[in-house]
């Protein structure tokens, strides 16, 4: 331990005082909630002020000002006291030798004011003896001698009209001199020169320069810009490439399709007219001899074989659902042959939403009607729904129809097959699968996207060139010529 600490006991007593935040015991909170919120009442030490009454404040200030002025007049010095100035009243303190304010002194005038004839300055001074003898009087008028050029205009050598030729610069040219600038060589002889197209001095032309007659045909440096979407997606770029290459072919196919649709429309009207005239029970359809070309016939490879047939009375309903289907694989076989020869994807078929809607409506409406088996359910339909009645009578006229009418409507295998797949294919096309031949990226939310060798199930043939199916959990439209049925 340090020596300074030995023998010393330091203890500091700390007084315990009350908390500064405690309120006084006699405090009474007489302030309302509104006054507490807005500080409308003054509290000592609160730092808040009460609302100001401006009228009361003005009166109070005016009264305080009057009181202050009265005190200043009473206690301050009085203006009447003093002896200085004109109004000083303490006369006993004034200087006895001082002149008062009522004294007016007369100042003597100057001699020039008392006698105007006196003085020697100026024009009218009369004291000539005092004027400067060498000074010129006011009556003197000095005349400046004119310059020689003012007296005789023929004098001088400057300018155009100067006559003193001896004073001029011998090397200077006169005003009568006209200088002629020598023309350039190209102005004197146009045949000279080597520049431009018509220069004749070929020996001066650059040997390595290309002549004007050797100019090649101008070519464009334009490069077609590739969109970001096409650059990022190989399938989209490939699709755009073949769409541009097959532009003419697609137009030709659209024209053929329009003609075919018009011909089919006329055929339908003729068949409907014949079906209305003929009223006879439906007969079993015999399989007609297949002609050389059947563009709209559904092959047996596409549909599974039919195991059972419905009674003849239900044939109108079968034909009603089957009617838009036969035109589906019209372009499949030629496109498949084309794809086998060429690995490039074909052009997309035209999007015809009108055709898709026409095909879909009878399929979805006719599906629930196949459930009841009794025959009377199928007979009254043609009376209530004339559109279905017209289409439903197609199978009954197979024997009476001529040529193309028999080709459009299939024999017994196709109607029975269509009816058998009605409940499933009509709603979703279940049971039909296909494998993708090319890569396709759907452009819209209702289109399907797939890669090569992908399996597409639940195919519904809703249009000639566009089918609807399911792939990778998505359901949508896709081009029929991009896939091959299994």
From Swiss-Prot:
UniProt-recorded Gene Ontology molecular function terms: protein kinase binding; protein-containing complex binding; RNA polymerase II-specific DNA-binding transcription factor binding; SH3 domain binding; signaling adaptor activity
Annotated positions of the Phosphoserine modification: 275, 333
In-chain residues carrying the UniProt-annotated modification Phosphotyrosine: 140, 198, 222, 388, 405
Region (Disordered): 226-430
Residues carrying Phosphothreonine: 330
Residue ranges of domain SH3 in the record: 429-486
Job description of the protein: Substrate of the antigen receptor-coupled tyrosine kinase. Plays a role in antigen receptor signaling for both clonal expansion and deletion in lymphoid cells. May also be involved in the regulation of gene expression.
Taxonomy of the source species: Eukaryota, Metazoa, Chordata, Craniata, Vertebrata
UniProt cross-references to SUPFAM superfamilies, sorted A to Z: SH3-domain (SSF50044)
Swiss-Prot/TrEMBL keywords: Acetylation, Mitochondrion, Phosphoprotein, Repeat, SH3 domain
Residue stretches of biased makeup (Basic and acidic residues): 240-258, 265-276
Protein name: Hematopoietic lineage cell-specific protein
Chain ranges passing through the membrane: none
Gene3D superfamilies per UniProt: SH3 Domains (2.30.30.40)
Spans of repeat Cortactin: 79-115, 116-152, 153-189, 190-212
GO biological process: actin filament organization; erythrocyte differentiation; granulocyte colony-stimulating factor signaling pathway; negative regulation of leukocyte apoptotic process; negative regulation of transcription by RNA polymerase II; nuclear transport; positive regulation of cell population proliferation; positive regulation of granulocyte differentiation
Residue list for modification N6-acetyllysine: 41, 123, 192, 241
Tissue-specific expression: Expressed only in tissues and cells of hematopoietic origin.
Pfam families reported for this sequence: HS1_rep, SH3_1
Organism: Mus musculus (Mouse)
Cellular compartments annotated: Mitochondrion
Location of the region described as Involved in HAX-1 binding in the Swiss-Prot/TrEMBL record: 27-66
Record note on quaternary structure: Interacts (via SH2 domain) with FGR. Associates with the SH2 and SH3 domains of LCK. Binding to he LCK SH3 domain occurs constitutively, while binding to the LCK SH2 domain occurs only upon TCR stimulation. A similar binding pattern was observed with LYN, but not with FYN in which the FYN SH2 region associates upon TCR stimulation but the FYN SH3 region does not associate regardless of TCR stimulation. Directly associates with HAX1, through binding to its C-terminal region. Interacts with HS1BP3. Interacts with FES/FPS. Forms a multiprotein complex with LYN and ANKRD54.
Gene (UniProt): Hcls1
Impact upon substituting residue 388 to F: Strongly reduces phosphorylation by FES. Abolishes phosphorylation by FES
């Amino acid at each position: 331990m340090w020596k300074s600490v030995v023998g010393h006991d330091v203890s500091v007593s700390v007084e315990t005082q009350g908390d500064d935040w405690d309120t006084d015991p006699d405090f009474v909170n007489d302030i309302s909630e509104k006054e507490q919120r807005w500080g409308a009442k003054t509290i000592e030490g609160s730092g808040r002020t009460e609302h100001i009454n401006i009228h009361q404040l003005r009166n109070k200030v005016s009264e305080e000002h009057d009181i202050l002025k009265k005190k200043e007049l009473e206690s301050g010095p009085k203006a009447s006291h003093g002896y200085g100035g004109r109004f000083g009243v303490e006369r006993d303190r004034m200087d006895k030798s001082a002149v008062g304010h009522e004294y007016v002194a007369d100042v003597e005038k100057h001699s020039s004011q008392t006698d105007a004839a006196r003085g020697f300055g100026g024009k009218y001074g009369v004291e000539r003896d005092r004027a400067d003898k060498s000074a010129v009087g006011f009556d003197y008028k000095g005349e400046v001698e004119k310059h020689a050029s003012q007296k005789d205009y023929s004098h001088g050598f400057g300018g155009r009209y100067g006559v003193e030729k001896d004073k001029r610069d011998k090397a200077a040219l006169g005003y009568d001199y006209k200088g002629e600038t020598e023309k350039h060589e190209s102005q004197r002889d146009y045949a000279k020169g080597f520049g431009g197209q018509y220069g004749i001095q070929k020996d001066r032309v650059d040997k390595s320069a290309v002549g004007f007659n050797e100019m090649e045909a101008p070519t464009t440096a334009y490069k077609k810009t590739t969109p970001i979407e096409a650059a990022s997606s190989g399938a989209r770029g490939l699709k755009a490439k073949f769409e541009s290459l097959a532009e003419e072919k697609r137009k030709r196919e659209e024209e053929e399709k329009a003609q075919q649709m018009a011909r089919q429309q006329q055929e339908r009207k003729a068949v409907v007219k014949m079906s209305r005239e003929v009223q006879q029970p439906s007969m079993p359809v015999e399989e007609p001899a297949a002609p050389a070309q059947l563009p709209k016939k559904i092959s047996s490879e596409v549909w599974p074989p039919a195991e059972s047939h419905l009674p003849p009375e239900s044939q109108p309903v079968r034909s009603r659902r089957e009617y838009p289907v036969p035109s589906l694989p019209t372009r499949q076989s030629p496109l498949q042959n084309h794809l086998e020869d060429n690995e490039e994807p074909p052009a997309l078929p035209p999007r015809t939403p009108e055709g898709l809607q026409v095909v879909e409506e009878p399929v979805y409406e006719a599906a629930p009607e196949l459930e009841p088996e009794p025959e009377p359910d199928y007979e009254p339909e043609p009376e209530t729904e004339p559109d279905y009645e017209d289409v439903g009578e197609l199978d009954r006229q197979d024997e009476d129809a001529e040529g193309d009418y028999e080709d459009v409507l299939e024999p017994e295998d196709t109607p029975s097959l269509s009816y058998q797949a009605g409940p499933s294919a009509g709603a979703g096309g279940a049971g039909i699968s296909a494998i993708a031949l090319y890569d396709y990226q759907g452009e819209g939310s209702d289109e399907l996207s797939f890669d090569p060798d992908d399996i597409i199930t639940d195919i519904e043939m809703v249009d000639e060139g566009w089918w609807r199916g399911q792939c990778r959990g998505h359901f949508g439209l896709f081009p029929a010529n991009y896939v091959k049925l299994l």
